[in-house]
Structures are given as structure tokens and as C-alpha cells.
Amino acid sequence: MAITASMVKELRDTTGAGMMDAKKALTETDGDMDAAVDWLRTKGLAKAAKKSGRTAAEGLVAVAVSGSTGVAVEVNSETDFVGKNAEFQEMVAGIAQVALGADDTEALLAADMGGKSVADTVTAKVATIGENMGVRRMAKLEGDIVVSYVHNAAADGMGKIGVLIATKGGDAGFAKQVAMHVAAVNPASLDEASVDPEMVEKERQVQIDIARESGKPEQVIEKMIVGRMKKYLSEITLVNQAFVVNPDLTVGEAAKEASAEITGFVRLEVGEGIEKKVENFAEEVAKTAKG
């Protein structure tokens, strides 16, 4: 496969690797972007990084909460300009309200919204606004306490990132702080028990390859892997992450102090999969939560 300059740039943006290293990684992996990231990590040339996808969507994520139920819905548009359009925002807010009564995206698209289906409503809006758009996905969360948070809000209840948090015990104020944390840190799972086993095994193999590159004895490598996997799991699971509001505590420890149990979370980001550089994002959210 021919390795293009744009592929090299994408890999460099994702991993921070040098130009020649990025090109070699792509050559060694026949242009497979995800495999190239792992190749660079194995060689110690890149930090663990989320793989950048190919989604190029704009639009908004809207959140809505009613009692013990919360929903987050992503509605895409072709340009960011449409996301600022009041007519588009009104439609997105309405779709989020309808989503409270839907079980999944398919049901949402078929649900009634002012006398016609959500799908037909969106189609009509395409004709009015003159730009392609669509409901990409929805997620639902239930719990004793459910709160929502929107980061980079474009209007009330909608923005670029939408988060839902469900807790048992505690109060809405603490749950809101956890929602801000999730927006900033983007955990993969709630706890170790809910982590995808395939993801863990893939990371374990990468760490084994990295350790073997060091040339250390196998028994030393085994101990290294145990420590590295423990660190990895603490970084990707919500309850084990350092709380952005108070980094001296993990989120789980903070929940215990607040007499709360976090039972679930949802985080949707517009165009999920695109790697976007946001400087001091966690610091920004921590200040907002404290303020």
C-alpha cells in the first residue's frame, strides 16, 4: 500500500512520533493506522494513544433528564455553522425529549415528533436548512440520581460533549462534578469488571512486546507486565482515576466520602473518533467544578 503524506501526518498527530518513525511504522504495517500506533508503542516511540478514526461529523450532542432517566443524543450536520443555527438547535432539543421514551436509535427514528417521525422531521429540516444531517446515535441511563453535563455548550442542554451520570446515594452536586470529570478524562469503563476483555488482552500484548524490547529476563518481564497493567486499568476505569476536582483522591474514594455509589455513566462526543487537541482540558473542567 502506498504511504501518503496525509497518512504520515495523521499518525504523527495521533502519537507525537517523528516523521521518519511514523512513515516506517506505516510501511511496516502496510498502512494500517491502528497497527502503526501499536508498532510505535512497541518500539517506545509513542505514548499510549487513542486511535483516531475517520469520522468527520459536526453537529451537537443533546442531553435530557426526566426523573430517574437520562438520555444523550448525537445529531450530526455537515458543518459546525449549522450547529449554531437556532432552528437546528430547536430540532435537536426536541429529539432529545422524544428520546426519553425510546429504547434505542432505531426506535427513536420511528418515534412521533409533532405528527411525523423523527426521521421525517430530520429529512424536512435538511430541505429547509440546505445541509445533510442525521441522528447518529443515542444512549440511555437510569439510576436513583441521574444528572447531565454539557461541555462547550452551544445552547441549553446541548454542545460538543454530553455526559450522564447515575448514582446511588450522595447528591446531585457530587454527581455533577463526576460528570465534569468524565467529560474531561473520558474513561473507557466504570470499573475493572466492566472493561472489555479484548481491549485488556490487546494492551497486555503491547506491553509484553515493549518489555521484551528491553532485553530483560522473562521473570523480570512478568513482574513488569503486572505493574504496567495495573497502572493501565487505573487510568481507563472511572472509579480508579484521579478525581480532577481533587487529584489526591480517586473518583471511587471521592464517591465514598460523598456517601455515593456511581452506578453508570454515558459520554457522547460529536464526531467521536476524531483526535482533537484541547489544551489543559482537565484543568479547565476542574476549575469549573470548583468554582
Curated annotation (Swiss-Prot):
InterPro entries: EF-Ts_dimer_sf, Transl_elong_EFTs/EF1B, Transl_elong_EFTs/EF1B_dimer, Transl_elong_Ts_CS, UBA-like_sf
GO molecular function, one term: translation elongation factor activity
Organism domain of life: Bacteria
Coiled-coil parts of chain: none
This protein's UniProt keywords: Cytoplasm, Elongation factor, Protein biosynthesis
Family listed: Belongs to the EF-Ts family.
Listed HAMAP family: EF_Ts
Function: Associates with the EF-Tu.GDP complex and induces the exchange of GDP to GTP. It remains bound to the aminoacyl-tRNA.EF-Tu.GTP complex up to the GTP hydrolysis stage on the ribosome.
Protein name: Elongation factor Ts
Organism of derivation: Jannaschia sp. (strain CCS1)
Annotated gene: tsf
